[in-house]
């Protein structure tokens, strides 16, 4: 079962990152600006000389849109704009949350929004926050790869949602081939990790699924075990 992806129309070599959303790459023998649609640091992926996949971009300040990084043994999706679509596809395909349906995308809750509102088989409501994971160390997928105050707030809001009668979940989409489990990145962002643990203790479900990228799409591999235990 595959989530279809647009095939890249350009390949190149990454040179350097300019800021959070832009970088320089060599494509077709010349240096060009590329748009990076991922707020993470991506230091383990975007290093000088790494092979990249991209699509030509019409309009805007950059010529190309980064879609993936090609490592020795894997392709890694680097496009957070697809995360919600992938999560909705997993639900609608019956791969996860069997019997649930997507009732709404980007539902409002409190002062913000979550990614998905699901309807359960019994008519209940379930809020889902989706996070993409591209960092892997020692076969563990780790999130985040940079401090995220916004992510911590999301966990607090999910906990509040359970108190108001919702089911609530955080779904981590893992895009690393070698990952065999998922853990919060305590060393990078202890505040987020603690907020995730508190949310789980308040009844928020924490799930992680692995997806493998190919040129034509993403393949669902399976669900990963989740370990929220502090390493100290």
Swiss-Prot record:
What's a Gene Ontology MF term here?
A: DNA binding
Supply the HAMAP family for this chain. SfsA
User: What is this protein's gene name?
Assistant: sfsA
- Which superkingdom, per the lineage? Archaea
In the record, the note on similarity to other proteins reads:
Belongs to the SfsA family.
NCBIfam families hit by this protein: sfsA (TIGR00230)
**Pfam families named in the record:** SfsA, SfsA_N
Could you tell me which species this protein originates from? Answer: Pyrobaculum arsenaticum (strain DSM 13514 / JCM 11321 / PZ6)
Name listed for the protein in its UniProt record: Sugar fermentation stimulation protein homolog
């Amino acid at each position: 079962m595959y989530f279809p992806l647009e095939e890249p129309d350009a390949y190149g070599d990454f040179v350097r990152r300019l800021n959070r959303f832009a970088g320089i790459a060599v494509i077709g023998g010349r240096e060009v600006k590329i748009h990076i649609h991922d707020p993470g640091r991506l230091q383990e992926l975007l290093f000088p000389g790494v092979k990249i996949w991209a699509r030509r971009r019409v309009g805007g300040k950059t010529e190309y849109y980064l879609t993936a990084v090609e490592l020795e043994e894997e392709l890694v999706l680097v496009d957070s704009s697809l995360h919600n679509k992938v999560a909705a596809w997993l639900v609608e395909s019956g791969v996860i949350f069997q019997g649930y349906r997507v009732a709404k995308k980007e539902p409002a809750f409190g002062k913000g929004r979550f990614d998905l509102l699901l309807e359960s088989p019994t008519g209940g409501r379930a809020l889902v926050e989706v996070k993409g994971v591209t960092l892997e160390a020692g076969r563990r997928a780790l999130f985040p790869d940079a401090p995220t105050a916004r992510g911590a707030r999301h966990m607090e809001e999910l906990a509040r949602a359970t108190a108001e009668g919702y089911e609530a979940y955080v779904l981590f989409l893992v895009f690393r081939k070698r990952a065999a489990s998922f853990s919060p990145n305590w060393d990078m962002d202890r505040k987020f990790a603690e907020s995730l643990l508190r949310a789980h203790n308040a009844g928020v479900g924490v799930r992680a699924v692995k997806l493998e990228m190919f040129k034509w799409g993403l393949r669902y591999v399976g669900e990963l075990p989740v370990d929220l235990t502090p390493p100290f």
